[in-house]
């Protein structure tokens, strides 16, 4: 909190906005047995307030079309992105400037919250100001290694997600430059 209040910049990516718990009996989703439905209770409100958002749920991984909705230096002139990722549903906290947005609707398999059927803009990158500082949060960023879901499944196919996309890597370069500038 003091870091941001004094002018610090914090770059947070993808799962940084998530706090999850499993609820209820075991459930099988896509061949993977989970210890229950995934719940995202608001148990870390101070942290989420610093971040500017809270992860609520996500749709099944799919291609997401993302476009700039701001003239901020981080996204100015950035080509539209089409990335394979988990389409995140976020709860915005506080005064945030949305930099990138997308639209999607659908089921949220394995989650307590959902389905998400309202066709509304979904933030993909946002800037949250606090004190003299700022937090930049990027929702895309899911990648899968072969052993990432142990102990739920022994091995699964690796997938780089948006990290394989040159436009996403350019966004990351800009975000890092912003964070260190």
Residue ranges, per PLM feature:
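Short amphipathic alpha-helical segments and helix-helix/interface helices
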Residues: 1-4, 89, 125, 176
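Short, surface-exposed, polar/charged, turn-prone segments marking secondary-structure boundaries
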Residues: 26, 32, 38-41, 94-95, ...
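Acidic-enriched, low-complexity/disordered segments with a strong bias for Aspartate over Glutamate
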Residues: 5, 39-42, 46-49, 71, ...
């Amino acid at each position: 909190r003091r870091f941001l209040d004094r002018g610090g910049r914090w770059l947070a990516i993808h799962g940084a906005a998530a706090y999850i718990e499993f609820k209820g009996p075991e459930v099988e989703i896509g061949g993977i047995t989970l210890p229950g439905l995934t719940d995202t209770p608001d148990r870390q409100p101070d942290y989420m307030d610093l971040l500017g958002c809270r992860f609520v749920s996500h749709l099944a991984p799919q291609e997401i079309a993302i476009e700039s909705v701001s003239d901020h230096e981080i996204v100015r002139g950035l080509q539209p992105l089409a990335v394979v990722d988990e389409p995140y549903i976020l709860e915005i906290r506080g005064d945030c400037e949305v930099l990138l947005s997308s639209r999607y609707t659908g089921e949220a398999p394995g989650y307590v919250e959902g389905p998400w059927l309202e066709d509304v803009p979904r933030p993909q990158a946002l800037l949250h100001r606090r004190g003299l500082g700022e937090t930049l949060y990027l929702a895309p960023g899911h990648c899968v290694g072969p052993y990432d879901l142990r102990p739920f499944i022994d091995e699964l196919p690796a997938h780089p997600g948006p990290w394989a996309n040159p436009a996403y890597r350019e966004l990351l370069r800009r975000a890092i430059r912003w964070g260190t500038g």
